[in-house]
A protein has these predicted regions:
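Canonical Rossmann dinucleotide-binding motif of NAD(H)/NADP(H)-dependent dehydrogenases/reductases
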Residues: 51-79
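Active-site helix of classical SDR
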Residues: 164, 204
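Active-site loop immediately N-terminal to the catalytic Tyr-X3-Lys motif
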Residues: 142, 193-199
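The beta1-alpha1 cofactor-binding region of Rossmann-like NAD(H)/NADP(H)-dependent oxidoreductases
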Residues: 87, 104-114, 146
């Protein structure tokens, strides 16, 4: 039953995706935007547009699951911004979906904070944050250095706190409170079923 349900959901998603791409092909195409976080030169989106659409930020959105998330929210007519270290894939995803790409290494606290603060300044608020970015270094624990372990946590776990904290601080100071908000953290069953060589990854996903 579960397998059939998942298959149906996947088929429905693929159908919506195909329809959206068809509409983009023959209708008005969205234009992707690329931002360098430190420049702060992006045009501000009017406040009335902000009220009509959900404002979404995704970490690690250039490829894989992150890209699928960016595509899904773009198809749902949301305002979508995402960050990634892969410049080429990030620009391509932004072009395909009409989203906004920020080239950011999330393990760099200042870069990630600048990115989130820039988006909050331009959009006025964020309705949804999806902490998706993740890396792994599968190696025996005896061959995993403290630096390797710290790197995994600095990418997989710490950004969850950074993005959530910044949004909480921002919301606290809003003149008109936003009653809507979602913070979605992509986890993994690995934290419950750790295997040899995945100690750092398991710790980061269970954090």
């Amino acid at each position: 039953m579960a397998d059939n349900y998942i298959e149906r959901q996947q088929e429905q998603y693929e159908a919506r995706k195909a329809a959206w791409k068809q509409a983009q092909k023959y209708g008005k195409k969205k234009t992707g935007t690329t931002h360098q976080v430190r420049t702060g030169q992006a045009d501000k989106i009017p406040s009335d547009a902000n009220r009509r659409k959900r404002r979404v930020f995704v970490t690690g959105g250039a490829e894989g699951i992150g890209k699928a998330i960016v595509e899904a929210f773009s198809q749902a007519d949301c305002l979508v911004a995402f960050c990634d270290t892969n410049d080429a894939s990030g620009q391509q995803t932004a072009k395909e979906t009409g989203s906004i790409f920020h080239k950011v290494d999330v393990s760099n606290k200042e870069s990630l904070e600048n990115c989130v603060l820039q988006i909050l300044k331009e959009w006025g608020d964020l309705d949804i944050i999806i902490n998706n970015v993740g890396i792994s270094n599968f190696s025996p624990i005896t061959e995993t250095s403290i630096e390797d372990f710290d790197k995994i946590l600095s990418v997989n776990l710490r950004p969850v706190f950074i993005t959530s904290r910044l949004l909480a601080i921002h919301r606290k100071d809003l003149s008109f409170p936003n009653p809507y908000g979602r913070i979605i953290n992509i986890c993994s069953t690995r934290y419950l079923m750790s295997e040899p060589g995945s100690e750092g990854y398991a710790a980061s996903k269970g954090g």
